[in-house]
Amino acid sequence: MGTSSAHSAAFHQSQIPNPQSQPLSTTTRSCNRLGILARMSAVLRTLTAPAARQIHRWVLGAFPRGQSTIDYDQPLGDPGIFGPDSVTWRVHSEFPGMLSGGLCALMLQLLHPRALAGVYDQSNFRADLIGRLRRTTNFVAGTTYAPRAEAEQLIARVRSIHSHIHGHTADGMPYDANDPQLLTWVHVTEAYGFLQGCRRYCRDVPAHIADRYYDEARRVAEALGAADVPASEAQVDAYFATVRGQLRMDTRSREVLDILTSIQLPVPAAGLSRGVFLGAGTALLPGWASDMLGRTTTQRAQAHASARLLRSLSPLFRTALRDGLSARACRRMQLPQTMLLEWPGAQ
């Protein structure tokens, strides 16, 4: 891939031209930037090491490794579905944005009666909500960072599982987990949550980068069978406006929300952690969704306080998780992890 090769060559070149004798090339400027970012990251790691170690243990307690058989290290040079030049690799590398955004997506999804019915009727979410969250996390991570063959196997496995999930809602409406429109709903809520989480808690996201993210992310949705998937921020806004008439908050929605908001992660300070991430997730909700969920003024104020706290902690998560799957994918491509700190095409 062109940009990846340029990054790799720039990072490994041993001779940097004298800026007084000739103009800096694009690859040289990229090398200089990555070098500065690497040094800044090293200083930050030193200063924040004790707190970062605690966060590292917290994350591994909530989402332990070893639950997936995917080899993220081989084969060398395999970019997977998205590759290192993608916005997706960068957005999905931000743990605070992904976890809060994923919770935001779940709260949006429970407002759709047909999307909720399959989960409500044909899953064990009541007894194993943590397991369900972990499996979803593994799917998103795998389709983002795994080699292409592994990612495609994940998609095929989910399609096979979906083929057995169908029935009728409490009101008699038919549902099918492979329904292209339901797949689009689930995808859009997730992509919206992840992007907003990244934007609010981790880094600035310019409008053209947001559009590129939505355009990239629909590859997985379409591979699963989704149809008419929005490909830009404006299209996502229009999609939400169109689908809102199908949404409602009912008894089932309330039950699922109560279970979600009482989840107990097997980590230290579980209640505090849950409060921060759930609050930060609800702070990402569109106003109309907060209204439908019946969020009170006090709850909204608490959510904004959680949002401010998570934003302040975001650099620590980045330091703590420098050995995560995004780093392994970068090594597979023989590229420095620091390249993920810049949006593609940054000069």
Feature annotation, model-predicted:
Residues 1-3, 9-26, 347:
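Short, basic, low-complexity termini and linkers enriched in Ser/Thr/Gly/Pro
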Residues 33-185, 189-347:
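Mature, function-bearing regions of proteins
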